[in-house]
Amino acid sequence: MELEHPDDLYYLDSHEYVRFDGETATIGLSAFAVDELGDIVFVELPEEGDKVEFEQSMGAVESVKAASDLYSPVTGTVIEKNSALEDQPELLNQDPYGEEGWLIKVRLDDVEDAKEGLMAAGDYRATLETGD
């Protein structure tokens, strides 16, 4: 089965994605990561008002197979978290890129440099294909 990796998103090599909308970034976990983890049973996210830093741990996700840290693809302040995932972590499995499966929304510290260090979708797909 071929996994979807939308072209309008940017990716971190640890498989988090980010969707930019002006000064706001929506962060989630890629379909590849969700598929690798299997059935997700627990999600820990930062609180609104918390600061997240590029490539620093911002939470965790646990599945029936493994536990994994979540890393922030941007630097900024959390303005919203997807609280539905606390009671329904399986939403990540069902819709990682959609209205129900995102993790947090962040107000960016630096809009100009926000994409630095991230991969465009084509580069991310190529990395997955080569296993780098």
Curated annotation (Swiss-Prot):
Gene: gcvH
Originating species: Synechocystis sp. (strain ATCC 27184 / PCC 6803 / Kazusa)
NCBIfam families per record: gcvH (TIGR00527), PRK01202.1 (NF002270)
Lineage of the species this protein comes from: Bacteria, Bacillati, Cyanobacteriota, Cyanophyceae, Synechococcales
Annotated positions of the N6-lipoyllysine modification: 65
Domain Lipoyl-binding positions: 24-107
Sorted UniProt keywords: Lipoyl
Keyword Ligase set for record: no
Protein known as: Glycine cleavage system H protein
Similarity-based family: Belongs to the GcvH family.
